Amino acid sequence: LGLMTGSEGLLGVITEVTVKILKTPEVVKAALVGFPTIEDAGKCVAQIIAEGCIPAGMEIMDKALTKATNDYSKAGYPTDAEAMMIIEFDGTEHDVEADMNKAKKIAEENNSSSLKISKSNSERLKFWAGRKAAFPACGVLAPDYMCMDGSIPRGKLAEVLKEISRLSKKYDLPVANAFHAGDGNLHPLIMFDANNEESLKKTEEFGAEILKYCVKVGGALT
């Protein structure tokens, strides 16, 4: 479907779509979970999915992006954590409670440093409002940023994030990580100055290495 959509009509034309209408969930809750390392957050994601605990949404941001987003949108994210995860469940009250408790237990097994569950729908929406403001918030970190887009197996999240950190040091360029953790879709944001030719050159090389590594671990360019 992604290939067909991305081809913009070149590979074919969709003439009919059948959709299934779902009931509005009885209960929707989200949680903010802090971690001491981004690798811990990646391992937590892989374990949550492996144990059959399927969330309605699951996103991760690193410390640099969390701080920028807090400054930009006053989202109230944990500022002392190296990585932060937003995880959301919907369904019946019983199912949501069971899933949230299971996710909390898995997070604790992966060294979570904090966990805050939404107490109202407005608080839940506030959690997500910060994530949606993440990209514009990058304006406080650098004059420009280049967004990479790659998908990897969820079990490889911790490994790939560790490699991105290594490459950041290699190229001496800051990187802010945001990604759709539930499906392994990464968006590393490389901070640079487009008016500096050397900075732009290093950024392009850095980005290419990230995407090559995504493919190396069994992922794809998206």
Residue positions per predicted region:
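Noncatalytic alpha-helical scaffold of FAD-dependent oxidoreductases
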Residues: L1-T222
